[in-house]
Amino acid sequence: MNRWNAFLCLNFFLPLPEASVHPLAWNLASALAFVLLGLEFRGRLAEQSLRSLPALPVTPAFSHSTLPLVLIWCVQLWVVVQWAITSLSPYDSLMSLSQGLLYAAVFTLALLLVDSRQRVRQLVWVVVAAAAFQALYGAFMVLTGLEYGFFAEKEHYRGVATGTYVNRNSLAGLMELSLALGIGLLLAEPTRYFGSARQRLRQLIEVMLSKKLILRLLLAIMVIALVLTRSRMGNTAFFASLMVAGALALVLMRNKTTATTVLLGSLLVIDIAIVGTFFGVDKVAERLQQTSSQTESRDEVTRDTFNIFLDNPITGTGAGTFTHTFPALKSSEVTSFGLYNNAHNDYAQFASEFGAPATIALAVVVFWAFWNGIVAMRQRNSRFYQGVGFSVTMAIVAIGIHSTVDFNLQIPANASLFVVILALSAVARWAPHNSTSGRMRRRTGRKASA
């Protein structure tokens, strides 16, 4: 198995063992990512030596990503400092460091390995396949009443879709990110109908027999699973991000076709009106209507988490320490008897654990990626990379909304996929228009020299 296929397998299997929330799972994933990263750099050093190149051969996406690479790796160095000196729970900070190294390695690998349209397609299909499996599994458990997670009977969230995840909101986060990639791929490869009625009919039949129909069906299944999670903010974030990214696409994209507008409109109408009607979007709406300050304590948890940040604005309490620091520092208004493993607000939790400088550094990486997505939609002449830019924009908006009330970025499988999408923003903006993979280019070069 080559490095690229191993990277695809890593992205496929991360969601399976309960979203890799257990230390064994994320430590193994981190070790694999570092092995792949080491092998990738060794291969590029060998290529540099073989071809007598003045510098290490890297992709355009990697060469334009110096700032985010420096920031994301410096944050890991900061966690090392926290673990050694300032953390209120050094063991938890060490575990968080292992997760952070996984994300940094995956981000770097994506910039180095995703160097062609073919590889972008393969990566998107792998992510969609992994999410579709989770969607089918979760929907099957709900509709049959079997209620099993990852080789164990579910203790919580019975009657709603969780897939092999523990938390329904985390599964909703996976659906949001994967749907963004899938919809972007549909936009990246639009169907064009032209010619006589007979030719148009032939083109329609070809579409019905192509991978596009399979992709559209998988996306519909994922929307069904999203609705079946009954996640209020998950569903809200998905549809809001689709509308925001869709509006930006219609305004920014050059040479828009009627098919683009029809596709975006059909996604909203079909998914809400048809899929939602049959699979219970009304129950999600009912949960939204029943939400009040009396039924939710997340607002108080977020407020107390922010107060913890104000007590440690620079150094933070230490990465990964929320579970052990919050019970001792929460106010008396938080009366829940359950243990809060996370703050239910990624912004507040990152700030309280990492401190302001590191949190700002991570925010810069996200805004850098968001800007790349916008620029790709506006300036690229390639419809394919415009579609990738759409995916990045939609995914960031979705997670940005959902993170106000949940903790998707504390879930290793979701956070890893998110950093892959951040890396794809550089691919969308800077990848050559008709790029082929580095492996294919090297083969072509050897044949030419022979």
Spans of model-derived segments:
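Transmembrane signal-anchor hairpin modules in multi-pass inner-membrane enzymes, especially those
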Residues: 1-95, 101-129, 185-216, 243-266, ...
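Membrane helix-loop boundary segments at the extracytoplasmic
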Residues: 12-20, 167, 349-354, 387-420, ...
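Helix-loop-helix junctions and helix-breaking kinks within/between transmembrane helices
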Residues: 18-28, 166-169, 209-246, 281, ...
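Hydrophobic alpha-helical transmembrane segments
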Residues: 76, 80-83, 119-150, 166, ...
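A membrane-periplasm/extracellular boundary helix in multi-pass inner-membrane enzymes
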Residues: 136-146, 189, 193, 220-230, ...
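Membrane-interface segments at transmembrane-helix junctions in multi-pass inner-membrane proteins
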Residues: 148-187, 233, 346-350
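TM-adjacent membrane-interface loops and short helices in multi-pass inner/ER membrane proteins
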Residues: 167, 299-341, 347-350, 354-361
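Hydrophobic transmembrane alpha-helices and their immediate junctions
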Residues: 356-390
